[in-house]
């Protein structure tokens, strides 16, 4: 049987690859494996049209096992994480495909602390999903209840408002909510700092999430930041667990640069635990050089924010994240939260009295190119001699200062190629060559 769980839960095209039957089986499996007697599950969703369908299927599955389900409705993923950990819930299930296009959806399971599951528990859930019809359900008089509970969202909003209240700024901010769930609270929370906040792409219709907007398409935000004369712009993704920034000139500041800005600020204030920053293998070598030159250390993990958090917990680090914009600031949250990241950037800008462009300039990056290649047989790349030979040849041309990474995506049906080195032209050339060969060999 094909593996269901990727690096960020279960994903697929709604009602095609990912069906209500999967959500129903997941509801039953989660209730059986994670929910003890009297402990409910909480379910949230982003703004996709298919969200209601999947949430209803989860409810049907879990309640058939005698477990109550609290429905919080449309919320950011970090909100569901906070709600799950703050309440008496056995687990949380988020219906979201994050930055993916609207036809996709996904199912993320969180443990009682609001954290993503480790792979051992995921494997157990997967076996239960495939065999969910063999699970013994509750009797008719012991079925679980579906409980609408929108008030739970206030727990998250009030906590983030308390973080905002500790910042006093007059920055002019533009935030792109990706027509996703972050729009429910982002503007209100950022305005609590005293900032002048303009909100864009906050009109979800079920089909426009991440469509030409948000963290994966920051071009529209960049134009608006310049046109409005704003100090800084922030782009969330569809479930608001990541953020990409834009400086006053419209220049995109990615997750690596944001992490560098935050790490340098904390190193200077001696408030970076163990002087450590946890990043993925994709993070730019320039970030590593900058942090190490400032007296810090870099710890690298596999790609995926759950691995970032795992690395932070093991090492005692307080800051970690990915180039894609997931940033975890452990003193405030145990998950990536684009709104919290925006608050932290605003705080650093205000404290330093410097522009984001100036702050980011202190974190010079090596030329890096990434390609995403649709691949039907993406899991076969390691056994392909032509691909391995091409990787070795590219590494030889780059020399010791360069890197090549090829990996299957854990969230999309693509192979990802990353090439990094001091010569930008050579980096682009090699990335194109590897992308073309990989697409040819794996399709």
Where are the regions that the model predicts?
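An N-terminal, well-structured beta->alpha segment
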Residues: 1-65, 90-91, 146-173
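Short glycine-rich phosphate-binding loop at a beta-alpha junction
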Residues: 38-46, 70, 172-174, 275-281, ...
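Buried hydrophobic positions in well-ordered alpha/beta secondary-structure cores of metabolic enzymes
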Residues: 8, 43, 80, 93, ...
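Gly/Ser/Thr-rich loops at beta-strand to alpha-helix junctions
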Residues: 47-52, 100-101, 178-184, 240-241, ...
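Phosphate-binding and adjacent anionic-ligand microenvironments
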Residues: 232, 269-443
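Gly/Ser/Thr-enriched, mixed-charge loops and adjacent short helices
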Residues: 13, 105-228
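N-terminal small/polar loop signature for handling phosphorylated ligands or for N-terminal nucleophile
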Residues: 29-32, 40-104, 188-246
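Proline/glycine-rich low-complexity loops and linkers
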Residues: 121-157, 162, 248-321, 327-329
